[in-house]
Amino acid sequence: MTDDKDEQHHFPGPGTLDRAVRLVRFLRENCPWDAEQTAESLIPYLLEETHEVVDAIQDGTFHDLEGELGDLLLNLAFQIVVAEDAGTMDAESVYRRLEEKMIRRHPQLFGGGEHPGWEVLKARERPPHEGVLSGLAKGLDPLTKSYRMQERVASVGFDWESYEGAWDKVAEELAEVRGAVEANDPAAVEEEVGDLLFAAVNLARLAGPHPTTALSRANSKFQRRFSRLEQLARERGISTKSAGLEVLDGLWDEVKQEETEG
C-alpha cells in the first residue's frame, strides 16, 4: 500500500475510545481495585457486559442499550490499558490493526477490486499451512461454532447446492435420533442429537437466519408466553404445579391466541 493510500484511507483524530482509555488510566492510577486488575481477571466482566448488550438489543430497550454499550466500551478500554501497562500494545496499535483489516476486507471501497466474499478474504489471511477450520475462537458457543465451521467449508465448495439438501439431512438425522431413543442407547442418542443440531444449524445457514439469533428469539418468545401463562393461572387461582398438562396446555393456547389477536 502506498503512502498516498495510507493518507487517503486513514481516519485520524481523538474520539470516544480515547476518552474511555484516559478514564481507565485515571482509574488505575487512583483506585486500588482498578489498579490490580489483569486481562484475565476482567474476562467475566467482559462476557457479562457483552451479554447485557445483546439483551438490550433484543429487548429493544435503547435507553438500556446506551448504558450497556458504555459498560462494554469501558471493558474494551480496560483491556487496552492493561495491555499498555504490560507493554504489549496500545490503543493506536489496536486501531491500526483494525483499520488495516477493514481495508483488506473491503477491496471494493479501497481500490482493491471486487469483493470476493468474506470467507475467501479471511482464508487469504490465514497462513498457507493452516486448514480451513483452524483459528476458530475456543470460546465460541456450540451453535456459533457449528455455523462458522459450515461457513468456512462452504467457502471451498463443501456445501449443499440449496437448502433442500440440508432439509433432507435434518429429516435423516431426526429419524436416527428416534432410532437411538427407541434402542435405549444413551451414547447413540447423544451422538445423534448432536448430529441433528449440527444439521439444523446448516439448514438455518442456508435458509437465512443465524441459528443463535433464531434460538435466542425462540427462547424469549417462550419465556414471554410462559410468564403470561403463569399470570393467567394466578388470576384464576390455578396452581401450575398441580394443574396438569391439559389445563396448562389450555392456558398456553389462550396466550398464543392473545398474541394473535393483539
Outline where the language-model segments fall.
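Flexible "arm" and connector segments at domain edges
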Residues: M1-E68, L74-V193, L197-G262
